[in-house]
Swiss-Prot record:
Superkingdom assignment: Eukaryota
Keyword line: Dioxygenase, Metal-binding, Oxidoreductase, Zinc
EC number, UniProt record: 1.13.11.29
Cofactor list: Zn(2+)
Family: Belongs to the DODA-type extradiol aromatic ring-opening dioxygenase family.
CDD domains membership: 45_DOPA_Dioxygenase
Keyword Transferase in annotation: no
Protein name according to UniProt: 4,5-DOPA dioxygenase extradiol 1
Functional note: Opens the cyclic ring of dihydroxy-phenylalanine (DOPA) between carbons 4 and 5, thus producing an unstable seco-DOPA that rearranges nonenzymatically to betalamic acid.
Annotated pathway: Pigment biosynthesis; betalain biosynthesis
Species assigned in the record: Beta vulgaris
Length: 275
């Protein structure tokens, strides 16, 4: 990936990074899903600049070591079962970004993540292509995807994001795609508004982010109420930590979407703008 200079660099520079809740993949065929209008009006209401490339961190790609896909055309991975047949026909043939992938690998290795590697076969899982299909339906922006390491902690993923922050200067949009809460499937649904345990976690997260208390988010296991219910497994939370790191040293957080599914699954999504 070529570095830019002068006016080109200034024009391409991106100050924002985003954490989005990608939601249930059923939203691809369910027009009334609350995330549909959020994603479909992304360029109109949230981020109008066209990035040079997108680096997306999805909670649906779990690996032992940080891995980034390096392909020329992204395959569409239908990594879900027992959904309407039409959903398995969707394709999001966004071009890959192999030069960016190699740059990511290089940066990570130089930043202490010596085991970082590329994957030359993997496409985009639904944590990536489902929101991107609605946000950028033309599929004309190069995309590469970065994995999470669920056996490690929030601080590790924050530091990984810090290493990648300079990519924004080259016009790379960094998006973390996970979920503000991601309870187990067997967690009882709450039909009278929002489950109190989920509301308490969401309130803590919102206040911590808006007030810049990223250290608390990094060690959420000792700070957050009901975290074991909200994130019994961390893979859908760690994309947020990567994006927090990518925001840099000084940033401002803004809640850009909030809705709920079953009163337990929070669709909270945030923009982080660097100073």
């Amino acid at each position: 990936m070529k570095m830019m200079n002068g006016e080109d660099a200034t024009d391409q520079m991106i100050k924002e990074s985003f954490f989005i809740t990608h939601g249930n993949p059923i939203l691809t065929v369910e027009d009334t899903h609350p995330l549909r209008p959020f994603f479909e009006t992304w360029r109109e209401k949230i981020f109008s600049k066209k990035p040079k490339a997108i680096l997306i961190i999805s909670g649906h790609w779990e690996t032992v070591k940080p891995t980034v896909n390096a392909v020329h055309i992204n395959d569409t991975i239908h990594d879900f079962d027992d959904y309407p047949a039409a959903m398995y026909l969707f394709k999001y043939p966004a071009p890959g970004a192999p030069e960016l992938a190699r740059k990511v690998e290089e940066i990570l290795k130089k930043s202490g993540f010596e085991t970082a590697e590329t994957d030359e076969k993997r496409g985009l899982d639904h944590g990536a292509w489902v929101p991107l299909m609605l946000m950028y339906p033309e599929a004309d922006i190069p995309v590469c995807q970065l994995s999470v390491q669920p056996h490690l902690d929030g601080t590790y993923h924050y530091n990984l994001g810090r290493a990648l922050a300079p990519l924004k200067n080259d016009g790379v949009l960094i998006i973390g795609s996970g979920s503000a809460t991601h309870p187990l499937d067997e967690t009882p649904h709450y039909f009278d508004g929002v489950a109190p345990w989920a509301a308490a976690f969401d309130s803590w997260l919102r206040k911590a982010l808006i007030n810049g208390r990223f250290e608390e988010v990094n060690i959420y296991e000792t700070k957050a109420p009901n975290w074991k219910l909200a994130h019994p497994f961390p893979e859908h939370f760690y994309p947020l930590h990567v994006v927090l790191g990518a925001a840099g040293e000084k940033w401002k957080a803004e809640l850009i979407h909030s809705s709920w599914d079953h009163g337990t699954l929070c669709h909270g999504s945030y923009k982080f703008t660097s100073a």
